[in-house]
Regions:
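Compositionally biased, intrinsically disordered low-complexity segments
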Residues: 8-9, 398
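C-terminal His-loop and adjacent cap/lid subdomain of alpha/beta-hydrolase
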Residues: 18-497
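Bacterial N-terminal signal peptides that target proteins for export
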Residues: 1-8
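Hydrophobic h-region of N-terminal signal peptides that target proteins for export
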Residues: 9-18
Length: 497
């Protein structure tokens, strides 16, 4: 046999080995005694999906996944091949295929409280309903125990069993400033989640009977979440996650609070400051990274320039988090069932209060900017219209440590603008004093009456300036047309015509 042909067959086999398989998908029934954790009608702000023309289904996704090593030079190698896993996904989509937009947003659900929390759903949910998108929540390894406590029978099959359970990790604190953790073993392997995520995308694009989106024309599948896992996926896994069609598993990415990459497996190292694996790499699909003003300084180490496929959007005046993120938390009874406790109450879902006490911000600044970013990403992927570039938030010159440059009202300069900072009536603090989450919560300091009178002749003058600013932001694609109309309608309700 011709050696060249043999070599070709070898290359073809290698390529086939890299093809993302479609996992087994099993639908879980909903009964009087068994339902999903995080079901829409059992969240802090319950949603009746049926009234909105949507349905919700839950599936177990199972298959085999590799565990990888990821070297500092960026090379990725299989450490343990074909380890079995089983995970759950929660899927929401229009009941009528004709009303489906063609876009699916996959969210790696937040596991900070040891149960699933669709944080980005809290921000984007209303807009995705308006667009006709599908949303898919994917469980993280850290939430598995919470699911099993919530309903042991329903979630008995879920597993990220460690294929090398006796491996003892000596985890170095690559970020600095802390102590190295003592050697430890784990019954679960975090690294299985990365191939699992690729296979979830393959399942969502599958047209086979029983597939989660069977009967729906899926044009694009996106991934969203906050912080490190999505960066690791983009940098290490995306280049090798190719479907049988030859297309990438994911068609684009929307990142909240882009940070350094996370470790790729239990005993992998976490890329630290200066590690070339940390910043988001250019890949063959669009990536939009969202950074609130309150996140900018901490994220400077991994900030990078925009490129043909990458945009970084820094949002002036915005804190890390606000009330919209918490709307999609499971209901308090479900939180208690999953973790044994629930923090605070629905109006303040934290154990400790800030000092002084502040309300949980209902500022729509992040929500509206995320909505526009989703539209920009979708247009970039499906229409080839590149997302606009934005100025970065300005850093003060000459400071001993990085510090945001502020305008005369105390709000950040530069970045993606909005009427709250362009036509100000307050200073928007992006952090608050107090324990726990307070450092991530913003609060508002209203300008005094004399200052307001010097800025706006009448309330109607203020309203006119806001409306003009909103029109400009909509035209520049920083707000959606729908959200622009909402802001102006609220102005009319407050101020009159």
């Amino acid at each position: 046999m011709n050696r060249g042909f043999v070599a070709f067959l070898g290359c073809a086999a290698a390529l086939m080995a890299e093809t993302v398989p479609v996992p087994k998908v099993t639908k879980l029934p909903v009964t009087a005694d068994s339902r999903p954790l995080g079901a829409a009608n059992h969240t802090l702000e319950a949603v009746d999906l049926a009234k909105l023309g949507y349905v919700e289904d839950e599936f177990i996704v199972s298959g085999t996944a590799n565990v990888y090593d990821w070297n500092v030079d960026g090379t990725v190698k299989v450490k343990i091949p074909n380890a079995p896993y089983a995970n759950r996904i929660l899927v929401r989509h229009p009941a009528d295929p004709k009303k489906f937009s063609g876009a699916v947003m996959v969210e790696i659900m937040n596991a900070a409280r040891k149960f699933d929390w669709g944080m980005m759903l809290g921000y984007l949910g209303d807009h995705m309903l308006e667009r006709g998108d599908a949303w898919v929540g994917v469980t993280q390894t850290a939430s598995l125990d919470g699911l099993k406590k919530f309903n042991p029978a329903r979630y008995a099959a879920l597993s990220f069993a460690n294929p090398n359970p006796t491996e003892s990790c000596v985890v170095l604190d690559a970020r600095g400033g802390g102590k190295n953790a003592p050697p430890s073993t784990s019954p679960m392997e975090e690294g299985l989640k990365f191939d699992m995520l690729s296979q979830v995308a393959a399942a969502l694009k599958s047209t086979a009977a029983g597939a989660p989106m069977a009967g729906f024309k899926v044009d694009a599948v996106y991934m969203t979440t906050q912080a490190g896992d999505i960066v690791t996926y983009i940098n290490a896994i995306h280049p090798r996650a190719t479907l049988a069609s030859g297309k990438p598993a994911y068609d684009g990415y929307l990142i909240k609070n882009v940070a350094a990459a996370a470790k790729i497996r239990n005993c992998g190292d976490t890329p630290g400051k200066g590690d070339p694996r940390g910043p988001v790499k250019d890949v063959n699909v669009p990536v939009i990274a969202m950074v609130a003003q309150g996140e900018v300084v901490a994220g400077l180490a991994t900030a990078r320039p925009d490129s043909e496929k990458y945009r970084r959007y820094e949002i002036a005046g915005a804190a890390h988090i606000d009330k919209y993120a918490y709307a999609s938390l499971p209901s308090f009874p479900d939180q208690i069932a999953a973790s044994g406790t629930a923090q605070g109450d629905p109006s303040w879902p934290f154990t400790a209060k800030c000092d002084p006490d502040i309300p949980l911000s209902g500022q729509t600044l992040l929500k509206y900017t995320y909505n526009a970013a989703l539209d920009n990403l979708d247009n970039w992927v499906r229409k080839g219209v590149a997302a606009p570039k934005a100025d970065r938030i300005k850093i003060k010159d000459g400071a001993s440590a990085p510090e945001i440059a502020l305008d005369q009202f105390g709000n950040g300069l530069g970045g993606i603008r909005n009427p709250w900072v362009d036509v100000p009536v307050a200073k928007y603090e992006t952090t608050s004093p107090g324990p726990g989450t307070c450092a991530e919560l913003g609060h508002t300091l209203p300008l005094n009456k004399d200052r307001l009178k010097s800025l706006y002749v009448t309330p109607q003058d203020y309203g006119k300036k806001v409306a003009l600013d909103v029109d400009k932001l909509v035209k520049e694609h920083w707000f959606t047309e729908s959200d622009g109309k909402k802001i102006k309608a609220e102005l009319v309700a407050q101020l009159g015509k």
